[in-house]
Regions:
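Extracytoplasmic thiol/disulfide redox context detector
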Residues: 5-88, 123-145, 165-178
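Thiol/selenol-based redox catalytic cores and closely related redox-interacting motifs
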Residues: 90-167
């Protein structure tokens, strides 16, 4: 009985690790980039901004915070970050974060600060915000986890990518290939 339980735990841990690291990805376009409502995102342009991606993220997501450290190291990219909280606490924090900024630059500053400092909080000012719509959009298009990255060419990766894998994916060679 004890060996069976240990085996079951090991199988479950392996499955969780696979989900957390590889998740799902597509190296063939299938997502229609034009379906994205870019005005509902927080935009950042780094370098020449030639490579364009959308990232569905949430301030309470541990893998999203880890992914932000990876995104810091990527150059020549335009990143559209869509706040897509998956639980009520993250929903409130996402709305507070969105409403605390009066423009894209302030929202970007607050988001990056929140990703590096879990204690960062923002005033609970109410405002019109796209957060609920981002969640509905995610459900409609089967974006069920954060972070999820979509390339302008329609390729999609759900889950965290280390820097080398992200760079490989951005170059069109596939996230997990040689």
């Amino acid at each position: 009985m004890k060996k069976a339980l240990i085996s079951l735990v090991l199988v479950l841990l392996t499955a969780v690790n696979a989900i957390a690291s590889d998740n799902s990805f597509s190296d063939t376009p299938y997502f229609n980039w034009k379906a994205l409502r870019l005005a509902d995102a927080i935009k950042e342009t780094k370098g020449n901004g030639a490579r364009v991606i959308a990232v569905f993220t949430a301030p309470e997501c541990g893998y999203c915070r880890k992914y932000e450290k990876t995104l810091e190291k990527v150059d020549n990219v335009t990143i559209y970050r869509f706040l897509m909280p998956l639980d009520p606490a993250s929903m409130k924090r996402s709305i507070d974060l969105w409403c605390s900024g009066h423009d894209n630059d302030e929202r970007l500053h607050h988001l990056l600060k929140a990703m590096h400092d879990r204690t960062a909080r923002y005033s609970a000012v109410s405002c019109a915000n796209p957060i609920a719509e981002n969640v509905r959009f995610g459900k409609k298009y089967d974006i069920y986890m954060t972070p999820t990255t979509i390339g302008a060419d329609g390729r999609l990766v759900q889950g965290y990518l280390p820097l080398a894998n992200l760079e490989r994916w951005l170059s069109g060679r596939g996230a997990f290939g040689p």
